[in-house]
Amino acid sequence: MLSQRVGILIIGVLATATFWLCRRYFQLRGIPGPFVARITNLCRVRWVGSRKSHEIHSRLHDQYGSVVRFGPNMVSVADPAAISVIYPARSGFLKGDFYHVFKSPDEPPDVFTAQDEGIHKTLRAPVAPYYSFSKLQSLETAIDNNIDRLFHQLDRKDSGDSTSLTTWLQAFAFDTVWAWMFTNPYGMLEMGSTEEKKTLESNWEIFQIIGPLSQSSTLRNLAGIINAILTALKIDSIPQLHKHTVSLIKSREEQFESSSEELNASDNVDMMTQLLLMKSKNSMIPPWTVSSLSLLNVFAGSDSTAVVMGTMWHNLLLHRDSMQCLYNELLEHEAQGSLTRPVPKWKEVRGLAYLDACLNEALRLHPPFCLPFERVVPDTGLSIGDYYLPPGTLVGMSPYVVGRYKPVFGQDADQWRPERWLECSPQDQRKMESSMITFGAGRRVCLGKNVAIMEIKKLIPAILLRYDIKLLDPTSFKVENSWFFRQEGLDVEMKKRDGSA
């Protein structure tokens, strides 16, 4: 009797497994892609684990077309025409479970990880106005102060010495966001290069783990179990920099709660104080909003900005004609009295045509985030070209792949050519701009987009006007991807220009 029950149980398990395997295999059977992707997500895990998933994804789309099956239930789309469908301004396409790995199981959702549209709106709506250009005066002050600190460090170096421009850009981006959030900079610019690099790379060490885990529901669940075990055993797996940031945020919240000082948002206060003031006047805001947003600003904001600046500098140094064009534009505006030194004002650089073209080209070629932004197909299903995706299918678009889509950006889409943004018609320019999802799209556009743009547009001209820079080894620049890009090998020789104060 027992053996009969065991046999029935085994048959039931096998039948269930066979059903699910067949369902996984056949529900997207008409969509092209690697055979192994039809039956397992392990190929996706391996692609991200290789740190070259952006290149692999791009090759897969070159081989199979605009719509490619990446996993049993995951489809990647390359055609920018699908952006407004997959990432609409209205609700409908929820974020997938991919985003679970970016927070601990016991942490509440933030504006990035929230899947529920209602929670996302509650978290985002009250704070969004603080990220508009008109509200970022305190950010410009932080940028100016940190450019001065960066120049002080660079001026002290002997002319002709090799220096890692990547590390300086990362340190600047981190200190600037830190000062914007908490008034005083962290001090990354004053650290020695070895200590500085080690501290800055703590985020990358985390993403090397959670990047691959994000590609498989089984591994995501395993990550939660591992985290629970580590917590139970009191094993610390959180980088010191992250812990220090959390501690400072908590301390600032406690100080604000106990303070009797009257403040208002029009005072010269840092971003965290503005957020705390906003929260104190709105009882509907979840209690964790300020702390979660502050962490996002510090870590996601600084890393992503540094990647874009690194991409810009690498290509400007590699293509000296582009750098000369940008330099000439700056000198021309300076001669007209519309650009000041040593640090140009935001109002002076926000509309420079060639600077805009270089920034757009950097955002297009190497966006900071290079995995598909996953969404869940709603109950209505989704038709993409000749293909139908049933409800529950995961669908996503990678900023890296979309930004190199040749029917929109040209047959030279893999090449650096800022002039593509200047030579085209206004209609084609709008089409290219709407075809980039570097900062997301629809209802989920990144809050920090304007923060990054202001930092980049002020720092790049300031450095170029002050220093003559030469790339020491054009072949040494390397990029890796595990959700965020990581760059290294941007070693340069910097010489202060004659007449620079």
Swiss-Prot record:
Report the locations given in the UniProt record: Membrane
Organism's domain of life?
Answer: Eukaryota
Coiled coil regions, renumbered to chain: none
Question: What is the applied biotechnology use of this protein, as the UniProt note states?
Answer: Shearone derivatives produced by this cluster are interesting candidates for Alzheimer's disease (AD) therapy since they moderately inhibit aggregation of amyloid beta 42 (Abeta42).
Q: Which PROSITE patterns does UniProt cross-reference here?
A: CYTOCHROME_P450
Query: What are its GO cellular component terms?
Result: membrane
Task: Provide the GO biological process annotations.
Answer: mycotoxin biosynthetic process
Q: Which GO terms describe its molecular function?
A: heme binding; iron ion binding; monooxygenase activity; oxidoreductase activity, acting on paired donors, with incorporation or reduction of molecular oxygen
- Membrane topology value: Single-pass membrane protein
Protein name from the UniProt record: Cytochrome P450 monooxygenase esdpH
Binding-site residues, heme: C446
* The family this protein is said to belong to: Belongs to the cytochrome P450 family.
**Residues annotated as transmembrane:** 5-22
Keywords attached to this entry? Heme, Iron, Membrane, Metal-binding, Monooxygenase, Oxidoreductase, Transmembrane, Transmembrane helix
- Cofactors (names): heme
Q: Does the keyword Transmembrane helix apply?
A: yes
Pathway named in the protein's UniProt entry: Secondary metabolite biosynthesis; terpenoid biosynthesis
SUPFAM superfamilies hit by this protein: Cytochrome P450
Q: What does this protein do?
A: Cytochrome P450 monooxygenase; part of the cluster that mediates the biosynthesis of shearones, diterpenoid pyrones (DPs) which are structurally diverse meroterpenoids consisting of a diterpene linked by a pyrone, and which may exhibit a range of bioactivities. Whitin the pathway, esdpH takes part in the molecular scaffold modification via the hydroxylation at C-6' and can transform shearone C into shearone E, shearone D into shearone F, and shearone H into shearone I, the latter being the final product of the pathway.
Entry EC no(s): 1.-.-.-
Q: Which Gene3D superfamilies match?
A: Cytochrome P450
Question: Which top-level enzyme class is recorded in the Swiss-Prot or TrEMBL entry?
Answer: oxidoreductase
